[in-house]
A protein has these predicted regions:
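Cleavable N-terminal signal peptides of Sec/SRP-targeted secreted and luminal proteins
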Residues: 2-18
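Chitinase-like catalytic core of GlcNAc-active glycosidases
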Residues: 17-252, 257-263, 272-285
Length: 285
């Protein structure tokens, strides 16, 4: 009975606090600036994507599409925008990987080297060549969609050992367990896990919410994470499949998951495709 009361209280607290909205920014020059993205007041977390090359001794490459060219030091001006976002209470993370890139980790030492690079160049460390300028980011997002899944657990561990809080997030595909990120997620070090419930018919919304809710409740709710997010495309054009109309999301799906203990909110791909979707769902998130 005591355990039941505790669980009930935690559910009540979760409902009262409400969820958050995370969004990916950086892959389309027409999506507006980072500062403008934060100024919409629609997002609590912004993932800057992507660091598309890293590991295996490669020189890391930051790809921000049409926004700026990091290779010629044109992205350091984003530091002021990052600072402005953080001043509004918005967490800003750097996303590793993405759907296209050349990235892999070949050993535990390789993972530690990548962690040190991230710390020195994007987090609380020091480097003469910080691609986004001097303002430190809040954390690192793992959007690993290519290569193998080895040693990402070691990367998560190394990022957690710098003596300063580094928020960690992961963006696995919804088929469970994720073939590349499950080992890292199982470390229990991730603050946020935003599962991509799209482009995967067996566990996405396809006119019916059954598969999605079964995946959420039976699979993903069992993982060791602080907060679990529902990852969705922000428009029908944002993904091949899995878009959920805002009215369906707010009336059928969010009421079924917001009371679950690990519910954290909704993640959207991406800012470019978000033409009012986040604003329309925000009151229900």
């Amino acid at each position: 009975m005591a355990l039941f009361k505790i669980l009930l209280l935690l559910s009540f607290i979760n409902i009262c606090v409400g969820g958050e909205i995370a969004v990916y920014w950086g892959q389309n020059g027409d999506e507006g600036s980072l500062g403008d993205t934060c100024a919409t007041n629609n997002y609590n977390i912004v993932n800057i994507g992507f660091l598309t090359v890293f590991g295996n001794g490669q020189t890391p490459v930051l790809n921000l599409a049409g926004h700026c060219d990091a290779a010629s030091n044109q992205c350091s001006g984003l530091s002021d925008e990052i600072r402005a976002c953080k001043s509004q209470g918005i967490k800003v993370l750097l996303s590793l990987g993405g759907a296209a890139g050349s990235y892999t980790l070949t050993s535990a030492d390789d993972a530690k080297n990548v962690a040190q690079y991230l710390w020195d160049n994007f987090l609380g460390g020091q480097s003469p060549s910080r691609p986004l300028g001097d303002e430190s980011l809040d954390g690192i997002d793992f959007d690993i969609e290519a290569g193998g899944g080895e040693f990402y657990d070691e990367l998560a561990k190394a990022l957690s050992e710098f003596g300063q809080k580094v928020y960690l997030s992961a963006a696995p595909q919804c088929p469970f367990p994720d073939q590349r990120l499950q080992g890292a997620i199982n470390t229990g070090l991730f603050d946020y896990v935003w599962v991509q419930f799209y482009n995967n018919p067996p566990c996405q919304y396809s006119g019916d919410a059954t598969n999605l809710l079964n995946s959420w409740n039976n699979d993903w709710s069992t993982i060791p994470t602080g907060k679990l997010f529902l990852g969705l495309p922000a428009s029908p054009e944002a993904a091949g499949s899995g878009f959920i109309p805002a009215d369906v999301l707010t009336s059928q799906i969010l009421p079924a998951i917001t009371a679950t203990l690990k519910y954290g909110g909704v993640m959207l791909w991406s800012k470019f495709y978000d033409n009012g979707y986040s604003a329309s769902i925000k009151p229900a998130v």
